[in-house]
């Protein structure tokens, strides 16, 4: 089985509040995005790693890191960025993993768990159990109901797809309100498997998240 990974690293990270996009900040000795690249590169079946970055970073990164991955140019939206990465995937690739560069703590074990499930079901997504009580709220600000937390999961990445399925999903126009890749496949009326991650895999969104990730990596 030959697999590819698309690392989405083209976001501006406005909520983080830094002049340098968070995925390129130094995190315990290496750029944030490189932690994810190395996690996928440690798995032999991943023959191709594509990092989608802002257009002004493509040449710089291609020269700085001449082996290990190739760069694709990011688009205006995440959908466009992943689609640009998808265009570089080889014809012999069986499964494609899409992963957020801002989740640098992803473990080899969790990648393999999601990949194993995807190999059986064609699509699998990393998830974590919802920890907080979740309320359904009306447009005018009133609580309609409390959702059953035991069946709620927070979607993470990687999200791993049979190649032809992801390409088919991305050949269609993105629907309004689509927030992740698996939703595109759901729109094809295809069941998506959920795999609970075993290790910390949070997304770096704030400076507090960054500091926590640094503490974990140094411990």
UniProtKB/Swiss-Prot annotation:
GO biological process: isopentenyl diphosphate biosynthetic process, methylerythritol 4-phosphate pathway
Pathway terms, separated by semicolons: Isoprenoid biosynthesis; isopentenyl diphosphate biosynthesis via DXP pathway; isopentenyl diphosphate from 1-deoxy-D-xylulose 5-phosphate: step 2/6
Catalytic activity: 2-C-methyl-D-erythritol 4-phosphate + CTP + H(+) = 4-CDP-2-C-methyl-D-erythritol + diphosphate
Transition state stabilizer (site feature) positions: 15, 22
Annotated S-S bridges: none
Pfam families: IspD
Enzyme class, spelled out: transferase
CDD domains: CDP-ME_synthetase
GO molecular-function term, one example from the UniProt record: 2-C-methyl-D-erythritol 4-phosphate cytidylyltransferase activity
Site (Positions MEP for the nucleophilic attack) location in chain: 149, 203
Keywords (A to Z) from UniProt: Isoprene biosynthesis, Nucleotidyltransferase, Transferase
E.C. designation(s): 2.7.7.60
InterPro entries from the UniProt entry: IspD (IPR001228), IspD/TarI (IPR034683), IspD/TarI_cytidylyltransf_bact (IPR050088), Nucleotide-diphossugar_trans (IPR029044)
Role description: Catalyzes the formation of 4-diphosphocytidyl-2-C-methyl-D-erythritol from CTP and 2-C-methyl-D-erythritol 4-phosphate (MEP).
Membership in a protein family: Belongs to the IspD/TarI cytidylyltransferase family. IspD subfamily.
Classification via PANTHER family: 2-C-METHYL-D-ERYTHRITOL 4-PHOSPHATE CYTIDYLYLTRANSFERASE, CHLOROPLASTIC
UniProt protein name: 2-C-methyl-D-erythritol 4-phosphate cytidylyltransferase
Organism per entry: Endomicrobium trichonymphae
Gene: ispD
């Amino acid at each position: 089985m030959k697999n590819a990974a698309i690392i989405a690293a083209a976001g501006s990270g406005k909520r983080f509040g830094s002049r340098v996009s968070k995925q390129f900040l130094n995190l315990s000795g290496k750029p944030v995005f490189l932690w994810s690249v190395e996690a996928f590169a440690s798995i032999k079946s991943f023959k191709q790693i594509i990092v989608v970055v802002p257009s002004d970073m493509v040449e710089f990164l291609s020269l700085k890191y001449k082996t290990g991955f190739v760069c694709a140019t990011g688009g205006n939206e995440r959908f466009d960025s992943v689609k640009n990465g998808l265009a570089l995937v080889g014809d012999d690739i069986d499964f494609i993993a899409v992963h957020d560069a801002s989740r640098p703590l992803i473990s080899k074990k969790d990648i393999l768990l999601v990949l194993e499930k995807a190999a059986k079901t064609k699509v699998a997504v990393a998830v974590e159990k919802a920890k907080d009580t979740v309320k359904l709220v009306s447009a005018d600000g009133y609580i309609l109901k409390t959702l059953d937390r035991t069946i709620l999961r927070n979607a993470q990445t990687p999200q791993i797809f049979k190649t032809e399925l992801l390409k088919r999903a991305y050949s269609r126009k993105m629907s309004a309100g689509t927030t992740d890749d698996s939703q595109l496949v759901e729109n094809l009326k295809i069941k998506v498997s959920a795999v609970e991650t075993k290790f910390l895999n949070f997304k770096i969104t704030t400076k507090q998240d960054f500091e926590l990730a640094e503490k974990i990596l140094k411990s």
